[in-house]
């Protein structure tokens, strides 16, 4: 969490990371050697970058690297935000490949400018019999929700410009290994091992997208002499996820167990003026998948239980002492292409905290009912698209509306004109309501190559 370099913040010493580094890099080395030996046994890896002969023809088969990427520029009434990614992909044979890439962000708000250049997805993928492996800097997706998910907890996120973020593009790459065992045509077993923890990143407290709890904490430190003991937001602290999947013609089901850390800091005022930050355990049991109700109706679902989660108390702009409670999440959703080029996607969600003592930064009531809706009408062979997106919390009254017009000039260039409307409902400091003054028109340029 970004507060200020001048505030009285004490950081706890990091744990002994040398041992974990040695274990992690040794595991990666052994994985690469194992996959390399498997591939060499099959085809010798003689064709990396060379020409070969396709089966049944005299035409040479050339394996060239593939370069792709995108650049996205968003502009509104008070800020602009550039995001870009370049990816280099090289096929190595027998389904093995190497992917490397880089990303950049450039955020401008009033007179504040912030550059950030960092590695993108960088990983090595290989197959060995009924197994496949993926190791490096990963961006993974779990769950069945399109706009929101109670299961998708592998990656932290970049919250650079608040609610205007794109759900899929703002995931933070994390070092890790993924392994999958294809047991038979119906079942597979997979898992992630993540040796290094990194927390989500937030905007500066001076940003229009700064969260209310962070501004309240800064006020305590600047004007009331408070002390904040911040937890390490990056450290060698192993996390893991295991999954058993089953697939049948009309039913998909995935069972998950996640032993992760909270991606957002838990802030607790344990003594008057003494604030402690932490990233405690987030242990989740979940199931997700889909059911073919009819030939034309597919229902997606998620059910998740997070045991004894830690919650930050935040009521009327004041930070209190943390508390503990289970968390239940339910999601049902479907999408469908209708006649006349009309598309609709709808999700319903329930979030339940049975032992909610008071309001938190992200949950205001013991049980909250939410829904997301996306409708899109295509014209002129999808060159012109009118899209409406909405997220509504029926319990608190908060909502986000983002109508858009998309002008697709080519496969490489798209212009977007839209508006973002944030409704505060009954609670002005709710997760959406605190940004109700940030309603703005939006112009966006998307370039893909």
Map each language-model feature to its residues.
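Repeated loop/turn-to-beta-strand initiation elements of outer-membrane beta-barrel proteins
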Residues: 65-67, 94-100, 130-133, 186-189, ...
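Transmembrane beta-barrel strands of outer-membrane/channel proteins
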Residues: 67-75, 100-104, 135-139, 191-195, ...
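Residues that define the transmembrane beta-barrel architecture of outer-membrane proteins
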Residues: 78-84, 115-120, 171-175, 236-240, ...
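Residues on the lipid-exposed face of transmembrane beta-strands in outer-membrane beta-barrel proteins
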Residues: 86-90, 121-126, 177-181, 242-246, ...
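Outer-membrane beta-barrel strand-turn architecture
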Residues: 91-94, 127-130, 183-185, 247-250, ...
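Outer membrane beta-barrel
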Residues: 96-210, 246-249, 422-426
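Outer-membrane beta-barrel "beta-signal"
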Residues: 159, 436-449
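Detector for outer-membrane/organellar transmembrane beta-barrel domains
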Residues: 248-253, 258-260, 290-391
């Amino acid at each position: 969490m970004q507060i200020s370099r001048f505030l009285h913040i004490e950081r706890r010493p990091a744990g002994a990371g040398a041992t974990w580094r040695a274990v992690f890099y040794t595991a990666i080395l052994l994985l690469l050697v194992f996959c390399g030996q498997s591939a060499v046994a099959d085809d010798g890896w003689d064709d990396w970058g060379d020409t070969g002969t396709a089966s049944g023809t005299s035409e040479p088969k050339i394996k060239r690297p593939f370069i792709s990427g995108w650049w996205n520029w968003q502009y509104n009434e008070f800020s602009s935000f550039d995001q870009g990614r370049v990816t280099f992909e090289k096929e190595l044979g027998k389904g093995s490949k190497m992917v490397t890439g880089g990303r950049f962000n450039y955020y401008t708000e009033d007179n504040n400018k912030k550059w950030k250049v960092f590695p993108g997805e960088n990983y090595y993928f290989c197959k060995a019999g009924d197994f496949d492996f993926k190791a490096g800097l990963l961006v993974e997706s779990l769950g069945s929700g399109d706009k929101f998910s109670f299961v998708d907890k592998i990656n932290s996120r970049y919250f650079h410009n608040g609610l205007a973020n794109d759900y899929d593009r703002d995931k933070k790459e994390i070092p890790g290994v993924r392994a999958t065992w294809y047991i038979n045509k119906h079942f597979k077993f997979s898992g992630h091992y993540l040796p290094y923890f990194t927390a989500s990143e937030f905007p500066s407290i001076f940003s229009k997208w700064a969260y209310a709890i962070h501004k309240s904490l800064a006020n305590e430190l600047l004007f009331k002499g408070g002390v904040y003991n911040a937890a390490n937001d990056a450290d060698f602290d192993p996390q893991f996820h295991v999954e058993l999947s089953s697939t049948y013609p009309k039913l998909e089901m995935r069972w998950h167990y996640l032993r992760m850390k909270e991606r957002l800091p838990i802030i607790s005022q344990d003594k008057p003026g003494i604030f402690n930050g932490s990233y405690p355990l987030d242990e989740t049991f979940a199931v997700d998948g889909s059911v073919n109700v009819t030939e034309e109706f597919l229902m997606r679902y998620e059910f998740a239980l997070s045991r004894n989660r830690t919650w930050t108390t935040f009521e009327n702009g004041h930070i209190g002492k943390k508390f503990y409670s289970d968390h239940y999440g339910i999601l049902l959703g479907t999408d469908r292409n209708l006649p006349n080029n009309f598309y609709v996607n709808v999700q319903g969600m329930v979030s339940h905290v049975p032992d909610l003592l008071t309001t938190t930064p992200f949950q205001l009531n013991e049980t909250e009912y939410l829904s997301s809706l996306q409708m899109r009408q295509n014209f002129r062979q999808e060159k012109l698209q009118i899209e409406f997106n909405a997220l509504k919390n029926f319990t608190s009254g908060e909502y986000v509306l983002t109508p858009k017009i998309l002008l697709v000039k080519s496969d490489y260039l798209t212009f977007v004109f839209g508006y973002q409307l944030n409704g505060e409902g009954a609670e002005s400091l709710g997760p959406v309501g605190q940004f109700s003054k940030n309603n703005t028109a939006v112009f966006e340029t998307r370039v893909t190559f």
